[in-house]
A protein has these predicted regions:
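A basic, amphipathic helix-loop patch mediating RNA/tRNA/ribosome contacts
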Residues: 169-216
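Ferredoxin-like alpha/beta domains used as RNA- or RNAP-binding modules
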Residues: 1-185
Length: 217
C-alpha cells in the first residue's frame, strides 16, 4: 500500500468513527475496486460499531461508495448517490458517444472522478451514477457532449433496468499465471498478450498488474 492509498484508507476509517461519534450516516466518495479491496483488508478489526455497506447503484457496479450508518438506523437513510439519464436532444443527428466522451464532459464541468461512479452507455443514451450532492449541478450544466446537444435528468432507481453482460469461459491451463489465464479468456497465445500486460492494460480486482507471471491462485 502506497502513501496515497494509506491516506484514503485512514480517511475512510475516520468517516466510520465520525458516524459512530455523531450518530449520523456518513458516505465516502466513489472508490475504485482496488481501493475497496485495500480498505476491507486495512479496516479488519478496526471499525467502530456501525453498519457498513458498499453502494454503487447496482449489484455488479465497479465504482462504489462506502456508506456507514449508526446501529439501529434503517432504510430511511438511503445511500447518498443519484442516478442520471443522459439522452440526445435529437437522436437522429447524435454522435456515437463513448464512455470516454461522457467522462470527459463531466471533467470539463470541473467534476472530480471521485464524485462519479459507473457510467453505463446504452445505444444513444447513458446512465450516470453520481454523488447526490452534485446531481443537480450536472443536470443543469451538462448540455453538450462533443457536438451533440443532450438532456440530463435525474431518474428513480426503479427506471434503471441494466444487467451487465458477462460470459463464462471454461477450459484447462497449465498454470494460473496471469498470461495463461487471459490467454484462455481471449483464445490467444501468451506471446500475443504480453504486450497488454506490460502496457498496464490488465487489472486484477481493480489493480493494474504488469507481470506476466503474476499468480492468480
Amino acid at each position: 500500500m502506497n502513501k496515497e492509498e494509506q491516506m484514503i484508507c485512514s480517511h475512510l476509517l475516520d468517516l466510520a468513527e465520525a458516524c459512530d461519534r455523531r450518530g449520523y450516516p456518513m458516505g465516502s466518495d466513489f472508490l475504485t475496486l482496488n481501493e475497496q479491496n485495500l480498505f476491507l483488508a486495512f479496516s479488519k478489526d478496526k471499525l467502530p460499531p456501525v453498519s457498513m455497506e458498499m453502494c454503487g447503484g447496482y449489484e455488479l457496479a465497479e465504482r462504489k461508495i462506502i456508506f456507514y450508518k449508526p446501529v439501529g438506523v434503517g432504510e430511511e437513510y438511503p445511500a447518498p448517490i443519484s442516478l442520471l439519464s443522459v439522452q440526445p436532444l435529437m437522436k437522429k443527428f447524435s454522435e456515437e458517444l463513448t464512455h470516454r466522451d461522457y467522462l470527459g464532459a463531466l471533467m470539463n464541468l470541473g467534476i472530480s472522478r471521485t464524485k462519479t461512479g459507473d457510467i453505463i452507455v446504452q445505444d444513444k443514451q447513458a446512465y450516470l451514477i453520481v454523488s447526490e450532492s452534485i446531481a443537480g449541478y450536472i443536470c443543469e450544466n451538462l448540455t453538450r457532449i462533443r457536438h451533440t446537444s443532450v438532456m440530463c435528468r435525474q431518474i428513480d432507481w426503479q427506471e434503471f433496468d441494466y444487467k451487465p453482460q458477462v460470459k463464462e469461459i471454461m477450459g484447462s491451463i497449465a498454470s494460473v499465471r496471469l498470461d495463461a489465464v487471459i490467454g484462455l479468456a481471449f483464445s490467444q497465445s501468451r506471446s500475443k498478450l504480453t504486450g497488454y500486460i506490460s502496457e498496464e492494460k490488465v487489472q486484477v480486482n481493480g489493480k493494474v498488474i504488469t507481470s506476466n507471471a503474476y499468480n492468480l491462485k
